[in-house]
Every structure is written in structure tokens, then in C-alpha cells.
């Protein structure tokens, strides 16, 4: 906690001279400590380790602060193409690639929310540069931020055209045209959304638009290592508890508690899934996924039989994941949400430190063990043996 960013007095400036304006890490960590009973469990684990000769437990709580944006500033742009058809359905194409992370669902939600129509009325087709050219990589956890904003701007352009047409067609003030779920209030009457679209088509109103978005405020001098490379930061914290076998080096992740900041979540189910998946992927990175070459320089861990990615059985026995309540991105990201792709990966550092904490108990916590990542059972056993030597 002594190393947390503070407020003012130079405690809120990064090494690359970006001021931290949305620092909530201390608040978030404090809330997780309370929820997972960190202090009480640490004391209980100390008591357990004094009585147990073979099995030792460890616990660790680690935070993460993850900057969101490409550090190559030119990548922070996106386009989208939206068509509204005369039956009231919407066709959407954007520059992001769906790879199972829920990007298409979130961007479709953004468009459906703007038009106030059901999600199943929005169809997304596969990303193609024939529709949206010069796409940026779907990376840096920025897919929803960039493509969601571009789609929102395209939809908003069409919505404004529809509103202007309705006001003129039914002779009412513009502020009396209100979009409601699947319908539009025009003065004292309500008409289905699809009926308004049909009337607009008959009135020769364009029902197609592109949208373009570029992330504001960011700049980065790579040579000098100075600037504001990130639009905002995503925060999270994880508390992990493990048990190790000091005779074999094998271990099990017994419990994980995560509290993560996603701002105003666009889709909590997707965000929770991303956090869980990112954490387990990070566990693999730090514990089992070892690259090993033989004396001839040949990679031997090149298949699922030797390169050990986490399986279902490696999942924590107890896995509690919560989104930070009341969080709201202070920057104008899409609907004040925050990115959630890569940040949770770093929360798995808590597993590595929990294993290290369990190993340290062998020497009654008097020495800090050397434990290299990935912390395979062999390396855990070596760390235990070094402390016993």
C-alpha cells in the first residue's frame, strides 16, 4: 500500500509523466480486503502452517492498474457502418474482430440502445475491410471502446435524421420527438419504430451512415518516454489462497476473490466471463505454461501434452468475482464503461505470490524464497528445498 499512487504531492504522476486522475486503487483494495476477510484468513493460515508438517498454505492480495489505449497513438481510431432497413431492422459492421470476447454483442447493444430497439433487431456481419477500411488491430483491450463509439456515432446520425423527419412530417417541435422502446413518441401519438423508418424512406431520408471515432486527449513521445499514452486506467485486485505439498511441489488454488473495476458495465455477464477467463489464463502463464528447449535447441513443450495450459480441474475451488459497484469511468468512454480484456490477466500474480507465501512458511517466514515463474511443481519443490538446506 505504501507504493500506491496518491493524490497530489507528486504521488499521482507516473514515470512517463501522466497524471493519475481516476485513482481508486486504495478504495478498491480496501473493499476487497473486507469482503474476503483477508486479515482474518492470513492469521488462520499462519496458525495452520504451524501445525502442518507437509501441507502448507499461502495467501496473497495483489492489485492492478492497467492503462487503456494503444501506445502507438495512430491505432486509436475506428470506423463503423450502419444501415437501417425499411422493416426496422439494423445492419451493423465495424472494424473490430470477434474472437469470443463478446465484442459483437456489446457493439450491437450500443446500437440497439441508441435506437431503443430490441437487440435481436440488430444484425452484425463479419468484419471486412470492404465495408470498414483501414481497421486497427483488435488489441490493447480497446475493441469495445473504439468500435462501440464509432457505431454509436453512425447510429446517432441516422437517429437525428429520423427525429428531424418526424418533427417536420407531423408538424411538431423537435423536442417532442422521443425514442421509446421499439416505438417513437411524436407529439401526442406513438408509432412503431419500423413505421417511422418506412415513412422516412418514403420521404427519401438517408437510412445509412458511417461513423468514425478517435480517442481524445492521448499523445505519446516514444523517444522521450513522455506523454499521455492512456485515455484512462482500469483497476482490479485479487486475493488468492493456495495449498502446496512440500514433499512433491504440487499445489492447488483453493480460493480466489476478485473485485474489478469495469466502469458502468455494458454487459455484466460478458465482463464477469472475461475476468474469470483472463485470470485463469494468467494462472497458466505464471504456473504451468513452461517453454523448455533441449540441448539441441529444439522446443519440447510444443503441444497440449507437454505445454500445460490450465484445464477445468485447475480452476480455483472457490472462485468469487465481483464488479466494483457504483463505478463510472470519469472519461467519456462508451457509456462510461471500461475495458476488460487484458487487465484481469495480471490479477493472477496473486497466485504466484500466494505460492511464494506458502513456501516461505517452511522457513517460518524469515526468508523470502526464490520462486521463478512459471511456478511449476518442480520449481516449487526446488524453492522449498533451498529454504530447508
Which residue stretches match the model-derived regions?
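C-terminal catalytic domains of large/alpha subunits in multi-subunit enzymes
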Residues: 1-64, 68, 109-389
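Conserved beta-alpha junction segments in alpha/beta enzyme cores
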Residues: 60-89, 94-101, 232
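Conserved strand-to-helix beginnings and helix N-cap segments that scaffold or border functional pockets
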Residues: 104-105
Amino acid at each position: 500500500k505504501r507504493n500506491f499512487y496518491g493524490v497530489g504531492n507528486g504521488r499521482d504522476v507516473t514515470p512517463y509523466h501522466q497524471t493519475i486522475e481516476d485513482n481508486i486503487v486504495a478504495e478498491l483494495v480496501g473493499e476487497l480486503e473486507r469482503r474476503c476477510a483477508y486479515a482474518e484468513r492470513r492469521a488462520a493460515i499462519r496458525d495452520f502452517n504451524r501445525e502442518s508438517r507437509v501441507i502448507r498454505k499461502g495467501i496473497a492480495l495483489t492489485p492492478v492498474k492497467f492503462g487503456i489505449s494503444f501506445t502507438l497513438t495512430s491505432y486509436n481510431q475506428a470506423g463503423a457502418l450502419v444501415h437501417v432497413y425499411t422493416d426496422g431492422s439494423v445492419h451493423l459492421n465495424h472494424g473490430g474482430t470477434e474472437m469470443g470476447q463478446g465484442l459483437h454483442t456489446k457493439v450491437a447493444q450500443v446500437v440497439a440502445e441508441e435506437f431503443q430497439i430490441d437487440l435481436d433487431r440488430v444484425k452484425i456481419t463479419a468484419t471486412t475491410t470492404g465495408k470498414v477500411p483501414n481497421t486497427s488491430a483488435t488489441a490493447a483491450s480497446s475493441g469495445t471502446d473504439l468500435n462501440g463509439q464509432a457505431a454509436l456515432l453512425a447510429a446517432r446520425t441516422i437517429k437525428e435524421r429520423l427525429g428531424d423527419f418526424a418533427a417536420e412530417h407531423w408538424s411538431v417541435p423537435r423536442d417532442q420527438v422521443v425514442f421509446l422502446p421499439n416505438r417513437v413518441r411524436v407529439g401526442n401519438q406513438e408509432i412503431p419504430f419500423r413505421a417511422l423508418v418506412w415513412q422516412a424512406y418514403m420521404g427519401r431520408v438517408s437510412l445509412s451512415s458511417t461513423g468514425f471515432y478517435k480517442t481524445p486527449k492521448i499523445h505519446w513521445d516514444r523517444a522521450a518516454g513522455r506523454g499521455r499514452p492512456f485515455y484512462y486506467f482500469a483497476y482490479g485486485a485479487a486475493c488468492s489462497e493456495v495449498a502446496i505439498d512440500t514433499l512433491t511441489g504440487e499445489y492447488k488454488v483453493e480460493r480466489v476473490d476478485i473485485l474489478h473495476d469495469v466502469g458502468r458495465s455494458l454487459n455484466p455477464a460478458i465482463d464477469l466471463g472475461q475476468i474469470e477467463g483472463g485470470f485463469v489464463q494468467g494462472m497458466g502463464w505464471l504456473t504451468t505454461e513452461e517453454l523448455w528447449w533441449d540441448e539441441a535447441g529444439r522446443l519440447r513443450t510444443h503441444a497440449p501434452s507437454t505445454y500445460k495450459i490450465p484445464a477445468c480441474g485447475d480452476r480455483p475451488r472457490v472462485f468469487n468475482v465481483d464488479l466494483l459497484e457504483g463505478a463510472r469511468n470519469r472519461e467519456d468512454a462508451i457509456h462510461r464503461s471500461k475495458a476488460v480484456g487484458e487487465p484481469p490477466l495480471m490479477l493472477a500474480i496473486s497466485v504466484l505470490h500466494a505460492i511464494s507465501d506458502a513456501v516461505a512458511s517452511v522457513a517460518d517466514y524469515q526468508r523470502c524464497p526464490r520462486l521463478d515463474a512459471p511456478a511449476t511443481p518442480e520449481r516449487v519443490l526446488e524453492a522449498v528445498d533451498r529454504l530447508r538446506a
